[in-house]
Amino acid sequence: MTGTARSALPLPQSPARALRPSGAARAAPSLSPSRFSACPLDPSSFPTSGNKMFIGGLSWDTSKKDLTEYLSRFGEVVDCTIKTDPVTGRSRGFGFVLFKDAASVDKVLELKEHKLDGKLIDPKRAKALKGKEPPKKVFVGGLSPDTSEEQIKEYFGAFGEIENIELPMDTKTNERRGFCFITYTDEEPVKKLLESRYHQIGSGKCEIKVAQPKEVYRQQQQQQKGGRGAAAGGRGGARGRGRGQGQNWNQGFNNYYDQGYGNYNSAYGDESYSGYGGYDYTGYNYGSYGYGQGYTDYSGQQSTYGKASRGGGNHQNNYQPY
């Protein structure tokens, strides 16, 4: 049996008929607010439309609420996020803000200096990577191998028309692995899915991330190494001069800004497309796609899913690279 089992689904005239029993189309599953996502959509995950900003130079102590309150004086803030280190949970010193109107961005830029929590911050108009296509493919982690393909079709089909489902197989055991890939015919179902980072599918809780091409994954790794290197200097400075003085922590955000933000996240989410894009995509490669922290060993890296049982058999401890 090949390493990856692909199940290509025909493109139906009506996704409700192709993926669900006959009758009225089911509504998308209701999504309870997740404690892991402070805002419904991560503004860093969508291409810029003129009303999105990158905010660099943030203090470690600045929260989403602080940033939102400050920028609300320039116009209505629809959404905001501050990127955090996936290991420590500490702010990485930059974030993104989405205004309702593009005119608000102009107002922010008209002011030469912006100071928040005792620090000069660096707001810029967000850049989008050229030629970026809207995300249509998602990675589903933490999926029980016992979940049937029909269950997967039923759940994800409720969000929109599915083009393809990929169910990777373990090349040694010929058994299903604990994750899959879903490709939709357009990007709208992906946006709906990412309104919640975690979804109850079958018998377990699964994490949803946007599938990133390997070249994007590698670019993210290079960017994140720069950010983490600066972070180390920042933490050292903080110990020597007191909290909030580690200026080097923020040096890494310039690299992120210069590279553009259309493909960051992660992750949406990553860390992302929260799902948040701010999660490191390290340790796992699947074909031409790169995936991140937690997929080499879900039980060890993602405590949300629980520890693997000592007796073995827990599907969450078998995410090893090909």
UniProtKB/Swiss-Prot annotation:
Residue positions where N6-acetyllysine is found in the record: K119
Biological process, per Gene Ontology: regulation of gene expression
Region (Necessary for interaction with TNPO1): 245-322
Pfam families assigned: RRM_1 (PF00076)
Stretches assigned to the RRM domain: 51-133, 136-215
Sequence positions bearing N6-methyllysine: K64
PANTHER family: HETEROGENEOUS NUCLEAR RIBONUCLEOPROTEIN D-LIKE (PTHR48033:SF2), RNA-BINDING (RRM/RBD/RNP MOTIFS) FAMILY PROTEIN (PTHR48033)
Protein name: Heterogeneous nuclear ribonucleoprotein D-like
Organism, as annotated: Rattus norvegicus (Rat)
Originating gene: Hnrnpdl
